[in-house]
């Protein structure tokens, strides 16, 4: 039995190549069908994100020893299929692709799900993507009146519980390491109840979208968006499925007069919010605390605005200092997380070994029972035909003993022939035999 991980990621391949090996819904469905038709694996889970494409195969018939010729041949078959479905030359993929099997494949999957292998260390989105990949696979096999193999399913369930444990026992995801999240984290440190605050977001690009999503997730209900093109701000509000007040840049002063927190990120070459505008707003607001976070380069907000009473002003440079400090904390937490992954990985393989021994014992007993029934049937026929009962029973016991001892005897002879003294000793101990 072998679990094989095959993939490329942001560490091994360019964006261009990663885009070529991505699986959309149509290609994923085709992949499931081809893998099943070619009997490449008993089950497979396909993980495809912007930063990685990985396939986790389970094949019960392949030896787990990496150097074994069956294993090498199977890995090559999987690689050739992967190149074929993406219509890529082998040479283009060979240097970028990686293979991991059994313990290493399980450890890799757990590290991926915990965010330890992500471009942004500890990012939480990858766990949801791994869960979605598993669900896609489960849906396919159910549509075929089948299911994901027990062992591969157990690996993914163990992975999900490991990621949950890492999140609860370490600080891997507690500190913001992106500008957008750092800005929102700073706002939460200064104001504790987003639901009662009024926000002004300036811009409607990717960074502001991330900011808006974070604010909404943490209870913000009163958000204004000011943008040079109001239609783009309206599109953003629709995408977020949240009612927002849309302003043009010419109406910035109106928004400032109402805002407790201003977060700005535009591509404007000119400053948009002057110290004088903030001063006017503060008079309108009766000098209630105001937080200004400028994450634009060049600046959107006058750096001198922070000199005003009850105004807290931060720039992208301030946020970078926060991010650096938080990243150091995440790296420390990542060491703890890696230890948890190792523990859970070992625990999974202990379970796997128990399952394999149980399966082996079950098959051995089934074979023995089949032999017993066949010999018993012959003995009953002999007795019915009038043969001597003592002779029939002696023959039954003789043949049954020979049949049950045939395979173990062959194994002992093979070990003796190869000079496997350790194997002979283990066999002798297991059978409670005393050396003569």
Curated annotation (Swiss-Prot):
Pfam families: GlutR_dimer (PF00745), GlutR_N (PF05201), Shikimate_DH (PF01488). It comes from the Bacteria. Its EC number is 1.2.1.70. InterPro entries: 4pyrrol_synth_GluRdtase, 4pyrrol_synth_GluRdtase_dimer, 4pyrrol_synth_GluRdtase_N, GluRdtase_CS, GluRdtase_dimer_dom_sf, GluRdtase_N_sf, NAD(P)-bd_dom_sf, Shikm_DH/Glu-tRNA_Rdtase. Substrate binds at residues 49-52, 118, 123-125, 129. Keywords: NADP, Oxidoreductase, Porphyrin biosynthesis. GO terms for biological process: protoporphyrinogen IX biosynthetic process from glutamate. It is an enzyme of class 1 (oxidoreductase). NADP(+) binds at residues 203-208. The keyword Electron transport does not apply. Disulfide bonds: none annotated. The record marks 108 as: Important for activity. One of its GO terms (molecular function) is glutamyl-tRNA reductase activity. The active site is at residue 50. Pathway: Porphyrin-containing compound metabolism; protoporphyrin-IX biosynthesis; 5-aminolevulinate from L-glutamyl-tRNA(Glu): step 1/2. The keyword Oxidoreductase applies. It catalyses: (S)-4-amino-5-oxopentanoate + tRNA(Glu) + NADP(+) = L-glutamyl-tRNA(Glu) + NADPH + H(+). Possesses an unusual extended V-shaped dimeric structure with each monomer consisting of three distinct domains arranged along a curved 'spinal' alpha-helix. The N-terminal catalytic domain specifically recognizes the glutamate moiety of the substrate. The second domain is the NADPH-binding domain, and the third C-terminal domain is responsible for dimerization. During catalysis, the active site Cys acts as a nucleophile attacking the alpha-carbonyl group of tRNA-bound glutamate with the formation of a thioester intermediate between enzyme and glutamate, and the concomitant release of tRNA(Glu). The thioester intermediate is finally reduced by direct hydride transfer from NADPH, to form the product GSA. Belongs to the glutamyl-tRNA reductase family. Homodimer. Catalyzes the NADPH-dependent reduction of glutamyl-tRNA(Glu) to glutamate 1-semialdehyde (GSA). PANTHER family: GLUTAMYL-TRNA REDUCTASE. NCBIfam families: hemA (TIGR01035). This is Glutamyl-tRNA reductase. It comes from Actinobacillus pleuropneumoniae serotype 5b (strain L20). The lineage of its organism: Bacteria, Pseudomonadati, Pseudomonadota, Gammaproteobacteria, Pasteurellales.
